[in-house]
């Protein structure tokens, strides 16, 4: 790791200390004046060649005085020949301006357009010319970044942080401090469903980043966009067919440092039964021990666990460029290990802060197999009519073992100094398979060229989540004189879960262009209809050892030797997670857009009608086993853009948006999780927000930018998950969603990108401030001395919001020698991880810095080698309570002043070395 860092720093320093004895120059676009990257500059007399850097600059060193001919060439520009005179010293910079190739050569023009689709120049142009507030990460930037998934890429954008998964990688996006529930995800502008069994949000770690042309984040909405995005919307623009043959391939391998240090524990996933005995044999079947495979109990160490990444993209246009085809695929197989310490806690008596009751030391071993495939066929019948068919399939398989030792602090056997405690051992083997599929037939038609056009989409999407035979086994144990020993079997659970989400949708947009008072005005009307059908299934079997007194090491040596008895032979399908849900969304909108002088105006109104319902298949006395929510929302919006100068904008926008409840969130039954109980809330309402944005934009050239913006959100009935007490049994608590009055969220965003000759800087900073006031529990003694729980109000930030977020990336590019390097750091400030039932006992996640590195070297022809390293600083995830209880003072790991540690996870570094081919 130190060697990689030294190499990167040496690359940076070499630029600073190099001396120039010859002459320098810049190459610009003749029309826009923007610097051009990657232009070939040939010094004809000496055959020396230079490529322009990140700021369009080039340099020739040790050039003897005299007359020279420069030949300047680029794929998308006309080749230019220019005569220059080189003096002994004090040579003035040579400024060269290139014009684009002749537009009559349609092939080259289309190539240029497609070549630029994933470029930094295109990304900056989209941000500048867009009708709304947005940020873009180009495919070019993604390729040279350390990030392998979209979830990790998106954290580089201002105002965006990520929620990590159990292996330390990013998983969900948090936009502008608004929890993951407040944004939606698009592929090529089409909303996709979520594989989650309860909620709507899409895990972004399922998407390999190499399949993208660019990643767009919309921070304000226009009327032609769906309205359920208070935080914003994420759009993945996938690779499109180029004009000439595209052939890109890469393969890489690497390792996780934690796997090297701790090893990797695996189980036999091949024998897992995809269906529970209830499904396989019918509802009246009594399951026995032989119905449960032993593979999930067969743990073994894996001595060789390398990571592997591979990708392939092939595309071209045919039939005089009328037919375009592209196919792309990506496969990633990663092994990760995590070391975790978790503390269970409880607020007792009148204590202000929680008391730690037990500590669990866990070791995770996780194998992730991520595959993605997409293809697109488009055909242009003529210049006025075009059809395309796009399909994408994403699959993420996660095989995880989790082994834990629980130390009970509340038991009388606990004596820390003597090394005595009551223990419990828990092992869990789990397979999760998530899939997302989308197929979109799209048409573009110019009915009256220049006057009337129509575009439409017919969409089928599906998402699936399967967790078959999730196996947990528990043993009792004891620690005596610091020696830990498993003893007898406590029990086992075998759980099956699955859910499917199928969407059929249609979109249509009709645009009429008219001139009013000499100004061109676009009037657009359109609509959407989506029919969503969701099903969810849950079943759980409880197993008990036949020999309840059997001792580990005497009667059995591993889990496969235990004889089991099934306590509930028919299973437990009567659960709130066994339900059907549906949602029918109908929307229509009217939008206008015009530009008068320097002012561009885009506005209109959208109306969305929602019919969301659920049906519990096995109710257990709930008062509303079947229910629905029907409502209509009117969502106006207005986006203003004023061009202060050619490369400067001031934007202002207003839009109203909503956030619908998740599918399970309105199902009234309870489910029992490992550490808490969870319940739905059929009275949960949608949240409505009014959103304001103001942003100043400066684009001095095609690669540099300065963006300074502020935003304000007023959210009615925001949805927050909190821990609540049962109304009839206050000692029982559960986790549930609720609406909490009115919340306010405002902030500041700054983006800055600057490229010098070979060095570039990308940095952004976001400040976010929100407040929401909710009821919290507090315990007191009344006048009789009896313990009583009262409600008090407390104001806090929104769940998941960090006040401070920042990114800094240092880039190095030497086109002549074929070097690309990037050192990227992302800071996420403290944020609430879990909202507590009790006042002052919310769980917070500590602020953290994640640093990653990537280096690439072109070696010959179309080949390059690259290296990527993640989590260089071994940044942990730390969860804590802002306060301490004196009763926790002598417990292990509780040494921080004014903090109660609840969880601490370490992941260590990951390394990857690969080869890339680009035709």
Residue ranges and their predicted role:
Residues 418-442, 573-586, 629, 658-715, ...:
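Outer-membrane beta-barrel signature, preferentially recognizing the C-terminal barrel domain
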Residues 827-834, 857-919:
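C-terminal beta-signal and adjacent terminal beta-strands/loops
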Residues 22, 293-402, 638:
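Transmembrane beta-barrel wall of Gram-negative outer-membrane proteins
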Residues 712-714, 732, 736-835:
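Gram-negative outer-membrane beta-barrel transporters
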Residues 61, 162, 190-219, 239, ...:
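Short acidic/polar hinge/loop motifs at secondary-structure boundaries
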